């Protein structure tokens, strides 16, 4: 049970996502007893990042509440980032691409300029893999926690170690611009 009013108050420009639906549903006290939502409340098995976990459990591709989204191509995204003065960086590849070298090479052939080597999602082995891959392909190395505020409360800003090379990363990013 939840209201359109709550969902609309959480959305920007009428755009609604699965995390917002989870937050709206969890605001109602009577939903605390709903067996579908119980894992997302405090001390539940999915409570570490409840809104994002709800999204992956119910709204992701192949799940009951999935709605198809038409995304722009990678090339279009890279062009928009560069036209806006940004640097196209591949974020936390260990979370979705893993160590698929063929896919990584396809992605960099589109014009990606760097890889988020240091990520809250990466194991030490993945950090080493992406560091070697990035250096081999002369890509920028970056670091990110993937902090998203209330949607990922278990992740904190600055909570990702980048082996003491913060200044080098920042310097290289500044030189690129």
Describe the role of every protein-language-model region.
Residues 1-97, 101:
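Extended substrate/RNA-proximal surfaces in nucleic-acid metabolism proteins
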Residues 76-86, 90, 94-177:
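Charged catalytic cores and adjacent phosphate/nucleic-acid-binding surfaces used
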């Amino acid at each position: 049970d939840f209201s359109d009013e709550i969902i609309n108050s959480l959305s920007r420009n009428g755009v609604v996502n699965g995390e917002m639906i989870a937050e709206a549903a969890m605001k109602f006290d009577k939903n605390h007893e709903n067996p579908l939502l119980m894992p997302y409340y405090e001390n539940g098995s999915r409570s570490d990042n409840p809104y994002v976990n709800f999204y992956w459990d119910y709204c992701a591709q192949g799940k009951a509440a999935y709605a198809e989204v038409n995304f722009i191509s990678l090339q279009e995204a890279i062009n928009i980032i560069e036209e806006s003065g940004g640097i196209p960086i591949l974020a936390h590849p260990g979370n979705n691409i893993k160590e698929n070298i063929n896919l990584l090479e396809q992605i960099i052939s589109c014009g990606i300029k760097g890889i988020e080597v240091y990520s809250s999602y990466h194991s030490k082995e993945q950090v080493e893999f992406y560091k070697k891959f990035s250096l081999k392909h002369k890509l920028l190395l970056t670091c990110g926690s993937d902090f998203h505020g209330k949607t990922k409360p278990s992740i904190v800003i600055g909570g990702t170690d980048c082996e003491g090379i913060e200044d080098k990363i920042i310097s290289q990013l500044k030189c690129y611009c």
